[in-house]
């Protein structure tokens, strides 16, 4: 290729269009200076009170007259100097007032893109994009965009990540979604009331507070101890109810769609092929109703909840969608450790179980809160046999399988000879599974 040919090719490329965030963004960023002052005041409450007592009304008004415009100017300038653009290969974000910073997010490294709307953002009609990128511990985000623009940008980024040409990616639009199920608010509320954490805190309060009153006869002492206990009990139920309200699960070509939230609305996507482990969690008080909770380990993503509560039959059908070709082993198929294992883990050894099928490595643990972990053979990165001195004396061992999401699933307290055979067999199943696995794709 000649130099002139390269120059002509560069000139023929469409110019990169830089865009700004939504105009309400300065209101969000203007809070930064105010937050610094509030943080200082909370950190040194006595010093802040002394400073306030020295201020006259005139001085306070002058200070507010300077602070508010300064904060507004900071918010405006930070918004004005923030741009983003989508190129052929990356999402480019430029920020900074004095020191310019440019973030280059490679499209092929994007694992998932979520659209979230906090309460005030819903009122203003804006949203923010959260991007799960390989190699980062936290999500990158663009905040804020118009709600429609956020969804359009998400669709464009996913289309480009899937390999669509840049000139057609913006025309692809958001992939259609088919609703699979919706968790009724009443079912969610009952399930949260039946979780162990709520009742543990209530039981602690019921026992500790009367004892505290008997010992001190001080109402303030009882309130000081009781309010945090009741607050913890409420937070474990009310907080989760607000976050998991109207949980809706849908299916689309780019993965499973999850919409949820009473105040802060979130729209998340579980990308296909990235699920490393699926867990079916069954608290004690849920068993009579046949409910389970479905959790995930997803490589490159912090999303970990697929279903907050669902009947077991429905949950198993959803698992079959997440892990095609996988059937959840029934409880009777899970083999317990031998009785001699009770010397290693008294009582709780009965909660362990193992089943290995052609598709998954399944391990169970827990008596009061059962958890069944399913790992597809193709997702196993390594296999380890662990045997401590006490286990060696009792002739048992643990077999650990490690996944790509930095997770580990263990088959506890297996007979030593069985564990050695399982170690070799699982390594071979993993190699075969990775060889025969279909490639991970964003879109069909």
Residue ranges, per PLM feature:
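N-terminal basic, Ser/Thr-rich segments that initiate or prime the first beta/alpha elements at protein or domain
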Residues: 1-444
